[in-house]
From Swiss-Prot:
The keyword Cytoplasm does not apply. Pfam families: GPI2. The gene is gpi2. The chain crosses the membrane at residues 80-100, 108-128, 141-161, 172-192, 224-244, 251-271, 277-299. The keyword Acyltransferase does not apply. This is Phosphatidylinositol N-acetylglucosaminyltransferase GPI2 subunit. GO terms for molecular function: phosphatidylinositol N-acetylglucosaminyltransferase activity. It is found in: Endoplasmic reticulum membrane. Its EC number is 2.4.1.198. It comes from Schizosaccharomyces pombe (strain 972 / ATCC 24843) (Fission yeast). Its main location: endoplasmic reticulum. Residues 1-79, 129-140, 193-223, 272-276 are cytoplasmic. Residues 101-107, 162-171, 245-250, 300-324 are lumenal. Keywords: Endoplasmic reticulum, Glycosyltransferase, GPI-anchor biosynthesis, Membrane, Transferase, Transmembrane, Transmembrane helix. Part of the complex catalyzing the transfer of N-acetylglucosamine from UDP-N-acetylglucosamine to phosphatidylinositol, the first step of GPI biosynthesis.
Length: 324
């Protein structure tokens, strides 16, 4: 039997199918071209699915735009206020221990504190406040009245403060003082870029905590005159001396560094006298860690910073003088 072979399709049918396929492809292409370009907006209904991601979606992505790379010595300079305040707390605690052990005269502490406060005020008035753009003329009469009021108030309250913790065990007094000093260190304002005339909440909490700790410690002294001089020293040390340190920091880096070294050395000598060499060495190690190891650590961690910005972020208003 002869093999049956399929007859070839007519030429007209082949041409017709080619025309139809070409028309379909052209129609699909026209439909795609008729779509409007995708825009990165949510409020407009577009001819694209909700999960559509255009190739231009991340064109506006920016990484680490606002990061400021700081050098080592700038970070060391920024760590000086921390070292200064820690040294100040250590010096104050060492002075109290020396007075409590009758190794140091409280009257001598009060005299040195008053003389230092007057000298610091003269230095601030004639030297420090001018480079800091502090053009306000100080009210000397008001300052004198405030000083007299503080002295008279402390003199009147000293007998009362002396008997404040008579019924409290010494261990409880030391524990309360330690916690208050920790609050002082934690809430202290270490930013010194500008001298702000207003008082911040956390800075006032720090000062109040230190003065409260001073009152608690002063209540363990035996004479009311010692309580008076010790609290007066605390007012100078925790209320006025931090302000003076800020002006020194703004005035000169070298003066700030010199004052930091003096405070650290004084704190080391004081700890060595009232405690031991081991505790003094631990304090120096802590200061070294804060001043040198932490800046290096911070610089190393900056390379892991990944902050992204783009046109999808919330617009920030640009405030300035109005035109016209």
């Amino acid at each position: 039997m002869d093999e049956v072979c399929a007859a070839p399709a007519p030429k007209k049918m082949v041409a017709k199918s080619l025309v139809l396929n070409t028309f379909r492809k052209a129609s699909v292409k026209e439909v795609v071209e008729l779509k409007k370009p995708w825009k990165k907006v949510l409020w407009r209904k577009q001819d694209y699915p909700d999960n559509f991601i255009d190739e231009s979606f991340l064109n506006g992505l920016q990484r680490n735009v606002n990061i400021q790379v700081t050098d080592f010595w700038s970070l060391v300079a920024d760590s000086l206020p921390v070292s200064q305040h820690l040294s100040s707390v250590v010096i104050f605690a060492s002075v109290f221990v020396s007075i409590y052990r009758n190794q140091l005269s409280c009257a001598l502490v009060g005299f040195v504190s008053n003389v230092s406060a007057v000298a610091a005020f003269i230095l601030w008035d004639f030297v420090l406040r001018k480079p800091c753009n502090n053009r306000t003329f100080p009210n000397y009469m008001g300052i004198v009245k405030s000083c007299i009021l503080i002295v008279l108030t402390l003199a009147g309250l000293s007998p009362i403060l002396m008997s404040l913790t008579k019924s409290t065990s010494p261990d409880s007094v030391w524990a309360i003082a330690v916690w208050l000093f920790l609050a002082n260190v934690f809430f202290h304002e270490y930013t010194t870029e500008t001298i702000r005339p207003h008082v911040r909440l956390h800075n006032s909490l720090s000062t109040n905590a230190a003065l409260s700790a001073s009152v608690v410690l002063a209540s363990r002294l035996e004479k009311s005159i010692n309580v008076f001089f010790f609290i007066l020293f605390a007012v100078h040390w925790f209320a006025l001396f931090p302000i003076f340190r800020k002006y020194i920091h703004v005035f000169s880096f070298y003066a700030d560094m010199l004052m930091t070294l003096v405070l650290i050395i004084s704190a080391y000598i004081a700890l060595n006298a009232v405690a031991s060499v081991v505790i003094a060495f631990v304090f120096l190690s802590l200061i070294f860690f804060i001043s040198f190891i932490c800046p290096i650590w911070f610089i190393k961690l900056q390379r892991f910073k990944n902050e992204i910005h783009g046109p999808w972020d919330i617009a920030l208003p640009k405030l300035g003088p109005s035109k016209g």
